[in-house]
């Protein structure tokens, strides 16, 4: 990133950056700069960093001050100081060393470049899947790798000059006849002439194949072939059908890739490098640790390796007249491998290691991963009005609520609490308000609760892989130091309660708060945005708890009363650990669920005790009763009788008909039913409030 580019971002307030291929002309524009004396600098030609005696950057090296700017602001390589931006008409550079008098921060964005002696294929576009070069050229990846690393040669498809040999297609360079009949009879100059006329190998062959075809023609031909394959239909052979399907998928990817190149104004031949950009020195520093021992970034060593091999190839092509062509092609392969290691170490097999058997970190290692430049440095920045803590389960919370510890909440909403204290004339200035907050006076917590009632918060769990990774909640104060979360929202966050941490953010603007309420609240994100399946589903521990709550005694009254195994102890009196006496045959009766739960709280009955609960009369229940035959009918002297069924009994009167119904249940079933009933009623109230009914 050069100075013009960074100033453009500041001037126009751009909100995004696009990463992609650039032309050699653009790389020149980034790196080249014209000194006041008219000299153009920017090319790095030497693999050196600092001089071992003077400890100053080497000229035209990886840390050259002429290319990347001064190490200290206003001080040139000679040690002379000049005022930056002075009004006097003094030269802005040193005439002796050629270093500009600018701010040293220029070394954070001023780039350089290495002029490669031969084209080099960008390994990301060749070896990464999908291989863009293979897709666009419609050739097997293995054949392209053979061309890139000089194992194959390719006859030029369009002979623009007279040819001496009739070569067609690609041929393996390792064949003995070709190996001994082509390169060994030429000097360096003669072999270059032969290659320019007859054959093409290395990244040069890839560049020619990418530059020749028109992208629109590729799209049209791929579309025609795709339609022809679709019209053929099934062949009856599964292998052939799968082969045709893979070919159609490949054609679709090829058309999409060509359209992307056209849409972004990127030329396919830019995937082959002629100029290699050199990062600014501050992004690949050399520092001194304890004892004065220097520590260098691995990128510097990989750059040095590229420069060494590139300079060797340049010498072979320019100074040596009798170098065999075999040696030239071998050196081109070494340059390609050095650039591959710089961009992505280990992508072609065993990674390059240093003297301590440690793998060098390449560009890919610096960028990707959790500790890479994007996730750790750019996306992992700390922001104001945010906190972080461990999450624990909050079973009593509503789906749209979360529990914030007092320590976190008072820090997040401190400015709002200060404003509330001043508005209510409880503090005359900000200092007194902060002192009340430090002393944790009771009025502070009251104002904090008022502020939190109308202010949602955002919870985020890294990595945020989809939009449900950050959701809005209505906060409430809880004790402790952990964030309480409803267990049903864990699936959207891909979180569990084994030590996971989540970040909490406070939306400040009205637009952010409105977006949080309308789009990001957890109770409005119940379905997966990808496939539409429910995302808020009970977890395994919740299902286990519901099973334990409702298991009770699953056998009916008939099985309990007339089972031979129970007849022996049927009339025996039993005393439990709470000294509550009851008979198995005389199960308690309750008029309402409140009475049953009250007896459970007073330890009169346990969670699984069977009981009879009076139930409201319902036409659907009456209709189902009329279709069943009772197990037993008990008559009383006052004209009432009891019809006993498997799980309920009906009290009838000879004169008045059905009087009431008792169902046979447990305290666990009652608790579960009441929770479901309250949830349904709450949903109906919110639905009617939202739609004004």
From Swiss-Prot:
GO terms for biological process: DNA-templated transcription. DNA-dependent RNA polymerase catalyzes the transcription of DNA into RNA using the four ribonucleoside triphosphates as substrates. It is found in: Plastid, Chloroplast. Zn(2+) binds at residues 76, 78, 94, 97. Mg(2+) binds at residues 496, 498, 500. GO terms for cellular component: chloroplast; DNA-directed RNA polymerase complex; mitochondrion. The keyword Transcription applies. One of its GO terms (molecular function) is magnesium ion binding. Its cofactor is Mg(2+); Zn(2+). Binds 1 Mg(2+) ion per subunit. SMART domains: RPOLA_N. This is DNA-directed RNA polymerase subunit beta'. Keywords: Chloroplast, DNA-directed RNA polymerase, Magnesium, Metal-binding, Nucleotidyltransferase, Plastid, Transcription, Transferase, Zinc. Its main location: plastid. It catalyses: RNA(n) + a ribonucleoside 5'-triphosphate = RNA(n+1) + diphosphate. It comes from Nuphar advena. In plastids the minimal PEP RNA polymerase catalytic core is composed of four subunits: alpha, beta, beta', and beta''. When a (nuclear-encoded) sigma factor is associated with the core the holoenzyme is formed, which can initiate transcription. InterPro entries: DNA-dir_RpoC_beta_prime, RNA_pol_asu, RNA_pol_N, RNA_pol_Rpb1_1, RNA_pol_Rpb1_3_sf, RNA_pol_Rpb1_clamp_domain, RNApol_RpoC1. Its EC number is 2.7.7.6. Pfam families: RNA_pol_Rpb1_1, RNA_pol_Rpb1_2. Belongs to the RNA polymerase beta' chain family. RpoC1 subfamily.
């Amino acid at each position: 990133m050069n100075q013009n580019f960074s100033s453009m971002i500041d001037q126009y307030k751009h909100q995004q950056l696009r990463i992609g291929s650039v032309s050699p002309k653009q790389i020149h524009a980034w790196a080249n700069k014209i000194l006041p004396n008219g000299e153009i600098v920017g090319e790095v030609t030497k693999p050196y960093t600092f001089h071992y005696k003077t400890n100053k950057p080497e000229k035209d090296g990886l840390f050259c001050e002429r290319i990347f700017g001064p190490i200290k602001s206003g001080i040139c390589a000679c040690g002379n100081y000049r005022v930056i931006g002075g009004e006097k008409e003094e030269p802005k550079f040193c005439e002796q060393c050629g270093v500009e008098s600018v701010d040293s921060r220029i070394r954070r964005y001023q780039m350089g470049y290495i002029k490669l002696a031969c084209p080099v294929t960008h390994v990301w576009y060749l070896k990464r899947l999908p291989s863009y070069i293979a897709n666009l050229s419609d050739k097997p990846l293995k054949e392209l790798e053979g061309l890139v690393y000089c194992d194959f040669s390719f006859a030029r498809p369009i002979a623009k000059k007279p040819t001496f040999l009739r070569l067609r297609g690609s041929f393996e360079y390792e064949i003995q006849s070709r190996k001994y009949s082509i390169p060994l009879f030429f000097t360096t100059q003669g072999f270059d002439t032969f290659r320019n006329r007859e054959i093409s190998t290395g990244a040069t062959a890839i560049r020619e194949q990418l530059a020749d075809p028109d992208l629109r023609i590729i799209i049209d031909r791929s579309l025609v072939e795709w339609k022809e394959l679709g019209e053929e239909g099934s062949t009856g052979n599964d292998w052939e059908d799968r082969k045709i399907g893979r070919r159609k998928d490949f054609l679709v990817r090829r058309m999409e890739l060509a359209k992307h190149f056209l849409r972004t104004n990127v030329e396919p031949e830019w995937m082959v490098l002629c100029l290699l950009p050199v990062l600014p020195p501050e992004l690949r520093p050399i520092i001194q640790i304890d004892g004065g021992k220097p520590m260098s970034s691995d990128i510097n060593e990989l750059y040095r390796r590229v420069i060494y091999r590139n300079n060797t190839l340049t010498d072979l092509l320019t100074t040596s007249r009798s170098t065999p062509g075999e040696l030239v092609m071998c050196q081109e392969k070494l340059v390609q491998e050095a650039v591959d290691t710089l961009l992505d170490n280990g992508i072609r097999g065993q990674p390059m290691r240093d003297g301590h058997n440690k793998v060098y970190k390449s560009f890919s290692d610096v960028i990707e991963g959790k500790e890479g430049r994007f996730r750790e440095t750019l996306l992992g920045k700390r922001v104001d009005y945010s906190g972080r803590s461990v999450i624990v389960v909050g079973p009593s919370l509503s789906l749209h609520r979360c529990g914030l510890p007092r320590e976190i909440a008072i820090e997040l909403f401190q400015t709002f609490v200060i404003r509330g204290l001043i508005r209510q004339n409880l503090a005359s200035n900000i200092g007194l308000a902060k002192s009340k907050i430090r002393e944790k006076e009771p009025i502070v917590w009251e104002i904090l609760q008022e502020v939190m009632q109308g202010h949602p918060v955002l919870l985020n769990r890294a990595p945020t892989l989809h939009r449900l990774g950050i959701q809005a909640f209505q906060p409430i104060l809880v004790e402790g130091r952990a964030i309480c979360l409803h267990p049903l929202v864990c699936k959207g966050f891909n979180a569990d309660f084994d030590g996971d941490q989540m970040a909490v953010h406070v939306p400040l603007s009205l637009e952010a708060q409105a977006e949080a309420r309308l789009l990001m609240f957890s109770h409005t994100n119940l379905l997966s945005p990808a496939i539409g399946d429910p995302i808020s589903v009970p977890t395994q521990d919740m299902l286990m708890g519901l099973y334990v709550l409702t298991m009770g005694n699953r056998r009916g009254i008939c099985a309990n009363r007339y089972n031979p195994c129970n007849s022996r102890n049927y009339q025996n009196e039993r005393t439990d650990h709470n000294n509550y006496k009851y008979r198995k045959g005389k199960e308690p009766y309750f008029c309402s669920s409140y009475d049953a739960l009250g007896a459970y709280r007073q330890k009169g009955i346990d969670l699984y005790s069977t009981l009879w609960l009076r139930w409201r009369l319902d036409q659907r229940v009456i209709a189902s009763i009329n279709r069943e035959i009772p197990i037993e009918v008990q008559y009383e002297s006052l004209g009432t009788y009891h019809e006993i069924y498997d799980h309920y009994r009906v009290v009838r009167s000879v004169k008045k008909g059905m009087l009431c119904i008792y169902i046979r249940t447990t305290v666990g079933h009652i608790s579960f039913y009441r929770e479901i009933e309250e949830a349904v009623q709450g949903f109906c109230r919110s639905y009617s409030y939202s739609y004004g009914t």
